Amino acid sequence: KVYGMNFKGWSDGSTTYASGADYTMPNRNVAFKAVWVQDQWDGITAVEPTKDEHGYYQISTGAELAYFRDTNSSNWKAKLMCDIGMGGHDFAPINQAGAEFDGCGHTIQGLNVVGDAYVGLFRAISSNCEIKNLTIENAVVKASRDGARVGILVGDVYGSLTVENCYVSGTIETADGTNKIESAGGLIGNVREYSNYSVNIKSCYADAEIKGT
């Protein structure tokens, strides 16, 4: 299996031929190379990913990320197995409370998150959570109601959170251009003040444009 990739066909250097297509051999040697293209989420499909021996979901497509988003477990663990493409389709935030998400050095591309009060790849963190080794590239994150808390990675935090080796870029804006955002940040939209919780951010950066009022 080539994680996150779809087989397109065979190329002779000038033309790509689909699997099973007829080909007339010329009077010379020809070298063919397999052509693979990145899998892109269709905006609808959710597919259950496999779990490894330690109980981590192994996510290799946008459809598997969509399934992970829709699970109800509060003790989730997941790893990205490859770069994944979200196709620019609207994606509701992941609504898990906490646990562990390891990007394993991979990138999420084409992410277009749309939500209401708390908006980001992760909607809100309310218990112990670790997010690490993840890049989100050129995301668009939109809030659809007044008073929203918006970040590319996490919308709102009211639990203990560690974020390490995470890099995000993109745009934060209101869904219709008129909603008022309460708080926004490239990485995290808002962190609530509670004495028994801690938020640690290590070796991370954000390059975000924030639009709206």
Where are these regions (language model features)?
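Solvent-exposed segments in extracellular or luminal domains encompassing
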Residues: 21-29
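Surface-exposed interfaces of beta-sheet-rich extracellular modules
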Residues: 1-21
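Surface-exposed repetitive/solenoidal architectures
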Residues: 15, 31, 35-213
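Proline-rich low-complexity regions
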Residues: 1, 26, 47-49
